């Protein structure tokens, strides 16, 4: 997928999630005005994810440049339409986590504005997820277990943002900590695993800056597969703290490998075990086939 960081097309449309992050609508408009100081761009505050996807597709088919303004979830929606229509997008990270932007070296709004005014183009890695009845993408990582439960709980904590938000969410999950049983198929071989977390990654960050996959881009044509299990509560908490630095991948309970694709099926009846999350959002239920996206 291609991210364009220069606003040079005649028609530019900003699709904005009004609820993303802590910025007010007025503040978001002010930031957008700094990108297009000489023009009055089309700014649309969308009300639903369906509207965001529909409008993105509409304008992309008319060769407009769409700027996704929101968190990882909003950017995910716009990016999926860009992939399906072979379009280019820009981003303004207005969310609480902003892990996809971070993976591109965009660590602030100021940096995002500079990039949109510059001439840099990035061809970005992403994941394809194939469920029984739908297809989705993930720009950062996607998985099951603690990752999914923490992402869900994070949406219920309105006052925090970034890694602190997701760390707190994960700690809440430890109250009823469970390793779930999954059937994992890699390279045609299927094995059952008791896992606390299982994820595929296209880029290094998740959870508002957690360095979950330091080796995400090590192999150009493969995604990073990570999973961990068999940990008691205290050991699991210690492992979580190591995720901030990326040193968790050295823990003996963590399996860190690369593959072109893998399939996960639930072997537990617990509802949490089957929920698949990616880019901080619910994407679907197991079973799922996850592969590295190949379409630019």
Question: Where are these predicted regions, by residue range?
Answer:
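Catalytic core of DAGKc-family lipid kinases
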Residues: 15, 19, 86-88, 92-200
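Short acidic/glycine-rich loop or secondary-structure boundary segments that cap or lie
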Residues: 147-150, 192-194, 205-209, 233-236
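Glycine-rich phosphate/pyrophosphate-binding beta-alpha loops
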Residues: 143, 147, 199-212, 282
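ATP/nucleoside-binding phosphotransfer catalytic cores, i.e., glycine-rich phosphate-binding loops
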Residues: 2, 25, 186, 192, ...
């Amino acid at each position: 997928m291609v991210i364009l960081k220069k606003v040079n097309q005649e028609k530019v449309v900003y699709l904005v999630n009004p609820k993303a992050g802590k910025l007010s609508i007025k503040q978001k408009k002010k930031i957008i005005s700094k990108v297009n100081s000489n023009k009055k761009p089309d700014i649309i505050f969308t009300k639903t994810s369906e509207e965001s996807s529909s409008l993105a597709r509409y304008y992309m088919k008319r060769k407009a440049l769409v700027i996704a303004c929101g968190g990882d979830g909003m950017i995910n929606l716009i990016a999926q339409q860009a992939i399906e229509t072979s379009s280019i997008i820009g981003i303004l990270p207005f969310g609480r986590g902003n892990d996809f932007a971070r993976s591109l070296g965009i660590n602030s709004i100021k940096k995002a504005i500079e990039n949109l005014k510059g001439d840099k183009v990035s061809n970005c890695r992403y994941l394809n997820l194939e469920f029984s009845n739908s297809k989705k993408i993930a720009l950062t990582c996607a998985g099951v277990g603690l990752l999914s439960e923490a992402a869900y709980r994070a949406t219920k904590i309105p006052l925090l943002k970034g890694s602190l938000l997701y760390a707190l969410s994960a700690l809440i999950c430890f109250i009823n900590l469970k390793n779930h049983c999954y059937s994992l198929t890699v390279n045609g071989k299927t094995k059952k695993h008791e896992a606390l977390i299982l994820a595929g990654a296209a880029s290094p960050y998740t959870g508002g800056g957690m360095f979950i996959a330091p080796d995400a881009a090590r192999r150009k044509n493969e995604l990073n597969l990570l999973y961990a299990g068999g940990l008691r509560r205290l050991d699991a908490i210690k492992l979580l703290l190591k995720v901030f630095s990326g040193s968790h991948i050295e823990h003996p309970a963590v399996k860190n490998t690369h593959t072109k694709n893998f399939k996960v099926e639930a072997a537990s009846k617990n509802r949490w075990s089957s929920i698949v999350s990616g880019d901080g959002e619910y994407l679907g239920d197991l079973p799922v086939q996850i592969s590295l996206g190949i379409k630019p």
